[in-house]
Amino acid sequence: MCACGSPARPPLAATTRTPQEQPPAPPLEILPGTPDPKLPTEVTSADGKQVTITDASRILPLTGAISEVVFTLGLGNRVVGRDIAATFPEAAHLPLVTRAHDVSVEGVLSLRPTVILADEETGPPEAMEQLRGSGIPVVIVKPAWSLPEVAPRIKAIAQALGVAEAGERLAGRTEAQVKAARAKAPAGAAKPRVAFLYLRGTAGVYLIGGKGSGADSMIEAAGGVDAGTAMGLTKAFTPITSEALIAARPDVILVMSKGLQSVGGIDGLVRIQGIAQTPAGQRRRVVDVEDGSLLNFGPRTARVLETLVERMHQA
């Protein structure tokens, strides 16, 4: 079975839940104290443009991952809108202005933001140009698809918002938590082969992750082997075929919760051609993680990693 489509990057439970049930997202651990932005700041956006921020009273993050950082820095009371991937409860009351990186210019401008934060995948490009043309400072932040990129992104967002010291503290705390989570992986144990599948059954999207998917970094940090990378997949995502699944030989299948739900839970998953012939399919070893946290690579990443360590190594 194959599919086309481009996934937003996708956290786990060895699962006996029904398709309607989903694992809880890791909670936000907001830094103590409310930082006072020191403005103006001038930063170099990831697209090379120099941006000056003079007012951070109405912040609009256009990705869930950036929203997570802004809220955890203690600036959530300044956020005026959210991306569809900002799934944590603290953001639930905010108006939705993007869907899968598709920005509504009219929706954004109606919120009167004083600074907009986006990443290189936010678009379409003409929408971003319109927002820049409106005079609102737009800062583009590099997306993070691996653990070493987490701290630099936290610091970049904090610097743009005039709270660099809080950014240093949050980055340091996150790095320490990630290190502690990695240390929980069993030493000397056989490493399970884990295949990350990006599933959107209602849209006919069935992809397997490979090198650069983001999931590969998490799987390896949790003491596993990314099955897609091990079988030689050089693209972040490749359409699933039964031959590819059988060749990947996963001991565990990792999915996002809504993706699992979209194919009818584990019962539906093992009916996808090739999955029942894998060790993971035969043993129904499936780990699903809440959609808004696995591939966010932010302050909650250590909690996701702890879940992976716990679930991937279950007998």
Task: Tell what function each PLM region has.
Residues 122-133, 252-270:
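A ligand-binding cleft/hinge motif common to bilobed small-molecule-binding domains
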Residues 46, 95-106, 232-240:
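Short helix-initiation/N-cap motifs at beta->coil->alpha
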Residues 63, 120-121, 143, 198, ...:
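Short secondary-structure boundary segments
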Residues 209-236:
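His/Asp/Glu-enriched short active-site or ligand-binding loop at hydrolase and phosphoryl-transfer sites
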Residues 32-37, 58-111, 115-121, 227:
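A short, structured surface patch at a secondary-structure boundary
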Residues 104-121, 136, 241-255:
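Proline-aspartate-enriched helix->loop->beta-strand connector
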Residues 49-50, 126-203, 228-229, 284-315:
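Extracytoplasmic substrate-binding proteins
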Residues 2-65, 165-197, 311-315:
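Bacterial Sec-exported substrate-binding components of ABC uptake systems
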